[in-house]
Amino acid sequence: MATRILGIDPGLRTTGFGVVECEGSRLHYIASGTVRTDALPNGDLPGRLKIIFEGVREVAARYQPDCAAVEIVFVNVNPQSTLLLGQARGAALAALVSGDLAVAEYTALQMKKAIVGHGHARKEQVQAMVARLLSLPGEPSRDAADALGLAVCHAHAGASQAAIAAVSPLARRAHAQYRKGRSY
């Protein structure tokens, strides 16, 4: 059975989205794009958050994903930028959970490592690898590529979790302890 995953790369001006379908180890591109708020004046934060909330909710309603993957906000040098990005992320998360979607969260480093092979990849490298992994005719925009990368990262994480669940109870317990930060 195929699982449809919606990836979200939150941003106050541009929020990227990407939808992939995972069937076994095969990934299929469904859609990608952006929710843009740059038509609004800079000071209209509530208006921007409303557009993000409604845009993400509309994307989820249109593509009917089974789950979502959202990028975790990193702490920037500028605390004000971090707070604003966190609010954009909150609007996207609220839209997803209002539709009863399960949401997984990944850092940019985790996503880049899953897509490119190392966590310090440049945006252009993510764009190129996403296009290659999903057999796209061209490279998606940076924000859409990051969102697709999050969806692919979640698909890979799900496959890993299923493989772990198939092994012995001791291995499952050890993995669960490892994920909680404990080791044996």
UniProtKB/Swiss-Prot annotation:
Top-level lineage group: Bacteria
Compartments reported by the entry: Cytoplasm
Annotated residues for binding of Mg(2+) 2: E71
PROSITE patterns given in the database record: RUVC
Keyword Acyltransferase: no
GO cellular component, one term: cytoplasm
Pfam family membership, one: RuvC
Main location: cytoplasm
Cofactor remark from the record: Binds 2 Mg(2+) ion per subunit.
MF (Gene Ontology): crossover junction DNA endonuclease activity; DNA binding; magnesium ion binding
EC annotation from Swiss-Prot or TrEMBL: 3.1.21.10
Record-linked CDD domains: RuvC (cd16962)
GO biological process: DNA recombination; DNA repair
SUPFAM superfamilies: Ribonuclease H-like
Gene3D superfamilies hit by this protein: Ribonuclease H-like superfamily/Ribonuclease H (3.30.420.10)
Catalytic activity: Endonucleolytic cleavage at a junction such as a reciprocal single-stranded crossover between two homologous DNA duplexes (Holliday junction)
Cofactor: Mg(2+)
Matches recorded under InterPro entries: RNaseH-like_sf, RNaseH_sf, X-over_junc_endoDNase_Mg_BS, X-over_junc_endoDNase_RuvC
Keyword presence, Metal-binding: yes
Annotated active site: D9, E71, D143
Group of enzyme by EC: hydrolase
This protein's UniProt keywords: Cytoplasm, DNA damage, DNA recombination, DNA repair, DNA-binding, Endonuclease, Hydrolase, Magnesium, Metal-binding, Nuclease
Subunit structure of this chain's protein: Homodimer which binds Holliday junction (HJ) DNA. The HJ becomes 2-fold symmetrical on binding to RuvC with unstacked arms; it has a different conformation from HJ DNA in complex with RuvA. In the full resolvosome a probable DNA-RuvA(4)-RuvB(12)-RuvC(2) complex forms which resolves the HJ.
Protein purpose: The RuvA-RuvB-RuvC complex processes Holliday junction (HJ) DNA during genetic recombination and DNA repair. Endonuclease that resolves HJ intermediates. Cleaves cruciform DNA by making single-stranded nicks across the HJ at symmetrical positions within the homologous arms, yielding a 5'-phosphate and a 3'-hydroxyl group; requires a central core of homology in the junction. The consensus cleavage sequence is 5'-(A/T)TT(C/G)-3'. Cleavage occurs on the 3'-side of the TT dinucleotide at the point of strand exchange.
Stated family: Belongs to the RuvC family.
Record protein name field: Crossover junction endodeoxyribonuclease RuvC
Organism: Methylibium petroleiphilum (strain ATCC BAA-1232 / LMG 22953 / PM1)
